[in-house]
């Protein structure tokens, strides 16, 4: 039975593949081992479900984060493009931005004459904002966006892998449970048959 859970088959992130029970009698040689075996399968099933919940939470965070990164990148690129045009009027840019989930407002952004002086502040999280030159900010945002998209792809693959393994483990648990029910019924019938024998 221990060899079932020591499978070397894993996905790219090291999540082990669920074993499939073809014949319960080959796994449980002694009926007294049923509880131990069933508990191991239940434990593995709960681990898969926990991993799936964790990956789904990661996907939810990434699906919120990616649009924010895309919007921030788009704004930074617009600022850089505006400064590249070298507008002679030196008039500030009028921007509309989201202040809250349901609240938008306007802002005037003064573009410095020298592009090297063009800087943006990026929220890094944990109430930390850093000021970056526009080109560095764009490179950082592109890298963060690519990393987030890669993480989303990986997490989505893991969720699908876990979903398949959860199904396999649920089938295994059902087969083990049904085997035990059948064994108990057979044992009960055998005991009743023995009672009916008269010597």
UniProtKB/Swiss-Prot annotation:
GO terms for biological process: microtubule-based process; protein folding; tubulin complex assembly. It holds the Pfam family Prefoldin. SUPFAM superfamilies: Prefoldin (SSF46579). InterPro entries: PFD3 (IPR016655), Prefoldin (IPR009053), Prefoldin_subunit_alpha (IPR004127). One of its GO terms (cellular component) is cytoplasm. CDD domains: Prefoldin_3. The modification N-acetylmethionine is found at residue 1. Keywords: Acetylation, Chaperone. GO terms for molecular function: tubulin binding. It comes from the Eukaryota. Belongs to the prefoldin subunit alpha family. Present with 6550 molecules/cell in log phase SD medium. Binds specifically to cytosolic chaperonin (c-CPN) and transfers target proteins to it. Binds to nascent polypeptide chain and promotes folding in an environment in which there are many competing pathways for nonnative proteins. Heterohexamer of two PFD-alpha type and four PFD-beta type subunits. This is Prefoldin subunit 3.
């Amino acid at each position: 039975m221990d060899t079932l859970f020591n499978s070397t088959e894993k996905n790219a992130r090291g999540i082990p593949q669920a074993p499939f029970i073809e014949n319960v009698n080959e796994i449980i040689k002694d009926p007294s081992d049923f509880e131990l075996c069933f508990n191991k399968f239940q434990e593995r099933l709960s681990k898969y479900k926990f991993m799936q919940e964790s990956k789904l939470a990661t996907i939810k965070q990434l699906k919120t984060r990616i649009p924010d990164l895309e919007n921030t990148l788009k704004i930074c690129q617009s600022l850089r493009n505006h400064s590249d045009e070298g507008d002679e009027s030196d008039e500030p840019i009028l921007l509309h931005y989201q202040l809250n989930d349901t609240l938008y407002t306007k802002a005037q952004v003064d573009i410095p004459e020298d592009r090297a002086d063009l800087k943006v502040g990026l929220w890094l999280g944990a109430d930390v904002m850093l000021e970056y030159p526009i080109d560095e900010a764009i490179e950082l945002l592109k890298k963060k966006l690519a990393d987030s998209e890669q993480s989303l792809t990986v997490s989505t693959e893991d969720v699908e892998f876990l979903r398949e393994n959860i199904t396999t483990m649920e089938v295994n648990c059902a087969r083990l449970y049904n085997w035990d029910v059948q064994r108990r019924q057979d044992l009960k019938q055998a005991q009743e048959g023995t009672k009916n024998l008269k010597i």
